C-alpha cells in the first residue's frame, strides 16, 4: 500500500502556465538559484557613518602607575552621596549588599591562575556577612566606614548579590588606600 502511494506521488505532475513558471525560481538546496536582488556590501571604511568630519582623537590612559580595578574605577573617586545612590540602585534591584576588602592586591594580578578572565586569581575577604534584609543605603555606608577604620590600607568594594539567580550582579570599588 505504501509503495503504491509513493509511486503515484512520484509520477504526479503539476501543470503550470508559462507565466507562473517564470515568476518563481525552482528551489534547490538551502538557497534559491534566482532570488531577490542581492545588495552588495561595501567593506570600505570610508563608507561608514561619519560625524561630519569632526573627529577628535581621545588620549589613551597611561600604562604606568594608573591601575584600574573594577566597575566605575575609571571615574574619579565617588562621593558619599554617589556611593549612596549606587547602593540605592543595588537595593532597588533586590540585590543583597556585601562588603569585601583586600589588603594586598586590589587590582588584577596573576599568582594562582594564568589565564585572563573573570576569575583572575584575586580572593577578597568578606567584611562580616552579606547584609540580607538591608533596605537603607546608610546601613551599607556605616559598614563601609567601620571597615575603613579597621583596615585603612585596604581596598574595599561593594558587591550586589542576586539571591534568586545566585550570582554577583554588581561590584565596584568604594574605597582605595592613600597613594592609589
Swiss-Prot record:
Give the matching InterPro entries.
Answer: RuBisCO_ssu, RuBisCO_ssu_dom, RuBisCO_ssu_N, RuBisCO_ssu_sf
The species is Spinacia oleracea (Spinach)
Alphabetically ordered keywords of this record: Calvin cycle, Carbon dioxide fixation, Chloroplast, Photorespiration, Photosynthesis, Plastid, Transit peptide
What's this protein's function?
RuBisCO catalyzes two reactions: the carboxylation of D-ribulose 1,5-bisphosphate, the primary event in carbon dioxide fixation, as well as the oxidative fragmentation of the pentose substrate. Both reactions occur simultaneously and in competition at the same active site. Although the small subunit is not catalytic it is essential for maximal activity.
Q: Which GO terms describe its molecular function?
A: ribulose-bisphosphate carboxylase activity
- Which terms does the UniProt entry file under GO BP? photorespiration; reductive pentose-phosphate cycle
Question: Any miscellaneous information on file?
Answer: The basic functional RuBisCO is composed of a large chain homodimer in a 'head-to-tail' conformation. In form I RuBisCO this homodimer is arranged in a barrel-like tetramer with the small subunits forming a tetrameric 'cap' on each end of the 'barrel'.
Family indicated by similarity: Belongs to the RuBisCO small chain family.
Broad class of where this protein is predominantly found: plastid
Any Gene Ontology CC annotation: chloroplast
Oligomeric and partner information: Heterohexadecamer of 8 large and 8 small subunits.
The keyword Plastid is annotated on this UniProt entry: yes
Transit peptide stretch: 1-56
Name of the protein: Ribulose bisphosphate carboxylase small subunit, chloroplastic 2
Q: Which compartments does it reside in?
A: Plastid, Chloroplast
Amino acid at each position: 500500500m505504501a509503495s503504491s502511494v509513493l509511486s503515484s506521488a512520484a509520477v504526479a505532475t503539476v501543470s503550470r502556465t508559462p507565466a507562473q513558471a517564470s515568476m518563481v525560481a525552482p528551489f534547490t538546496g538551502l538557497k534559491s538559484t534566482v532570488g531577490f536582488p542581492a545588495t552588495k556590501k561595501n567593506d570600505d571604511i570610508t563608507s561608514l557613518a561619519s560625524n561630519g568630519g569632526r573627529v577628535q582623537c581621545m588620549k589613551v590612559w597611561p600604562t604606568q602607575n594608573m591601575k584600574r580595578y573594577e566597575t566605575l574605577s575609571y571615574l574619579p573617586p565617588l562621593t558619599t552621596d554617589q556611593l549612596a545612590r549606587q547602593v540605592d540602585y543595588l537595593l532597588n534591584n533586590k540585590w543583597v549588599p556585601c562588603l569585601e576588602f583586600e589588603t594586598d592586591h586590589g587590582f588584577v594580578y596573576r599568582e594562582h591562575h594564568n589565564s585572563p578572565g573573570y576569575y583572575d586569581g584575586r580572593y577578597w575577604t568578606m567584611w562580616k556577612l552579606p547584609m540580607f534584609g538591608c533596605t537603607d543605603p546608610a546601613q551599607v555606608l556605616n559598614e563601609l566606614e567601620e571597615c575603613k577604620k579597621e583596615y585603612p590600607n585596604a581596598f574595599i568594594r561593594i558587591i550586589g548579590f542576586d539571591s534568586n539567580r545566585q550570582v554577583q550582579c554588581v561590584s565596584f570599588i568604594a574605597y582605595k588606600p592613600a597613594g592609589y
